[in-house]
From Swiss-Prot:
Organism: Exiguobacterium sibiricum (strain DSM 17290 / CCUG 55495 / CIP 109462 / JCM 13490 / 255-15)
Lineage of producing organism: Bacteria, Bacillati, Bacillota, Bacilli, Bacillales
Binding annotation for Zn(2+) 1: 138, 141, 195, 198
Gene Ontology biological process terms in this record: chaperone cofactor-dependent protein refolding; DNA replication; protein refolding; response to heat
Record-given protein name: Chaperone protein DnaJ
UniProt keyword annotation of Chaperone present: yes
Major site of localization recorded for this protein: cytoplasm
Length: 368
């Protein structure tokens, strides 16, 4: 079934503030929470609400959703969604709620890593090996936390559920809330003889090397999702995901604007006046560019297809060359003499006609 638009699910405008999104979720969650609404589709509607809120309440996820919708290319096909954590979202507003079985398989935590690359690596794409600290099941006790040859015992207070039930009177009526068992701290089991390697935690921290393929055309701040490269799951659950945020270092010549490249190209007075054919550096290599006579500072030339590749389509943007005319310093006497001679024989009227608007404004400024 095709997913509905998250803004439509919450009944808010696309430019809604964080506070408006929060209010909309609270109102609808009260209506469709399965503990309150006994209709057959209430549970599914509540999951849909919680999924929408989970994305739109997070600035980064909301920005990606606004740009790509449900199919975010940086997610490696995963897109947005998933029902994990919905109980936690409701608990954040209303307290209590239902708890997950502590012995049930749970997905490992997602991780984020920032990788810095050069401008040219962003142009061509690059493969990197990164080292990330992760938590994995202890190899000695295989995640049980118990000393080899022994086994964890089921908590007698909660019967292995990890929580105890407490009845409370609420605005919804009498509701049974589940709270964490204080004896086993939510694990459902008690380790009497802890593993010496992990000291009973069942997990150890280690460094893991991960190979990351960064696609050509990736822009600063974009991220890559590596499914299953996060932390190990709990109780045999799946691994979490790894999100690699790419930072692109600035280039000494080129500036990226979307998929285009902009650069300043210095020209001498003679080149700009008489015209010339010059070599222009691009990320694709050197390109010949004809400079017409009479080129002014601020003139811009376009080199089609010489920009960055689009990370999704592969289509290349353009390169824009901005002309900057360099005024010479430390002239020789002969050069000064020639410039004075040039100035004397120049047609000032012709220059004024070429820049009539500028000269007119200057005269008005002085004469009033």
């Amino acid at each position: 079934m095709e997913k509905r638009d998250y803004y439509e699910v919450l009944g808010v405008a696309r430019d809604a503030s964080a506070a408006e999104i929060k209010r909309a979720y609270r109102k609808l969650a009260r209506t469709y929470h399965p503990d309150v609404n006994k209709e057959a589709d209430a549970d599914q509607k509540f999951k849909e609400l919680s999924e929408a809120y989970e994305v739109l309440s997070d600035d980064n996820q909301r920005a990606r959703y606004d740009q790509f919708g449900h199919q975010d290319p940086s997610q490696g096909g995963g897109g947005f969604g998933g029902a994990e954590g919905f109980g936690d979202i409701f608990d954040m507003f209303f307290g209590g709620g239902r708890r997950q079985d502590p012995n049930a398989p749970r997905k490992g935590q997602d991780l984020q890593y920032v990788e810095e690359i050069d401008f040219m690596e962003a142009f061509s794409g690059v493969e990197k090996v990164i080292t990330i600290p992760v938590e994995e099941d202890c190899g000695t006790c295989h995640g049980s936390g118990a000393k080899p040859g022994t086994h964890p015992e089921t908590c007698k207070r909660c019967g292995g559920s990890g929580h105890i039930n407490v009845e409370q009177n609420t605005m919804f009526g009498r509701v049974v809330n589940q709270t964490t068992c204080s004896t086993c701290h939510g694990r459902g089991q008690i380790v009497k003889e802890p593993c010496e390697t992990c000291r009973g935690a069942g997990r150890v921290r280690k460094n893991k090397d991960v190979r990351v393929k960064i696609p050509a055309g990736i822009d600063n701040g974009q991220q890559i999702r590596l499914a299953g490269k996060g932390e190990a799951g709990v109780n045999g659950g799946p691994f979490g995901d790894l999100y690699v945020v790419v930072r692109v270092r600035e280039h000494e010549l080129f500036e990226r604007v979307d998929d285009h490249i902009v650069m300043d190209m210095p020209l001498t007075f003679a080149q700009a006046t008489l015209g010339d054919e010059i070599e222009v550096p691009t990320v694709h290599g050197k390109v010949s560019l004809k400079i017409p006579a009479g080129t002014q500072t601020g003139s811009r030339f376009r080199l089609r297809g010489k920009g960055m590749p689009n990370v999704r389509s592969g289509h290349h943007g353009d390169q824009y060359v901005n002309v900057v005319i360099i005024t010479p310093k430390n002239l020789t006497d002969r050069q000064k003499e020639l410039l004075r001679e040039f100035n004397e024989i120049s047609d000032e009227k012709g220059v004024e006609e070429q820049h009539e608007g500028v000269f007119s404004r200057i005269k008005t400024f002085f004469t009033g």
